[in-house]
Amino acid sequence: NQSSTRDETSKGLAAQFEGQSSEGATAKAKGISITVRGEVQNRRTSSSTFTSNDRGLGLSSEKVKQVDDGEALFISFDKDVIVESAAIVAGNGTCGGFYRVGDHAPLAIYCVDADIDEKDQSGLLSDIGVLKKGQTLRLDSSPHFGTESPGQWRLGGLTIRRLKN
């Protein structure tokens, strides 16, 4: 049996993280707690907070307040879940970076630009996989292999399905 939880940017859980320390913040929806923390240059920092707007969740450590080069979001849950998708919204920023489920191999983040003007890039990472209770999903704006362009984006949404034992 499975139940579904869906978050759509500031209308959902993202607004609950607004202004909270990126050292770690927790919100609850439909019986599942989600914990998000941010890192800058692979370090936890108390100087940044989460920000949200109509495009999604970002970090305040840079001027643009997105997830910029060298920044990452770490997401975990208090239950076993299937992460069906994560929406990445770059807007005027740049898609790029990687995601990683637990200790599995990292995979590149790619986006599309509907009208090729580089002003509305977005991507949907789908079929991400099972995330066991306490495991982390890392969404990182750093280049995947160190040679690609870094990302500058927001987490626009997350769709999960709870696994019932």
Residue ranges and their predicted role:
Residues 78-86, 134:
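Extended extracellular/luminal ectodomain segments enriched in beta-structured repeat modules
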Residues 1-70, 132:
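N-terminal targeting leaders for non-cytosolic proteins
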Residues 139-151:
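Short beta-strand-plus-loop segments that form exposed binding edges in beta-rich domains
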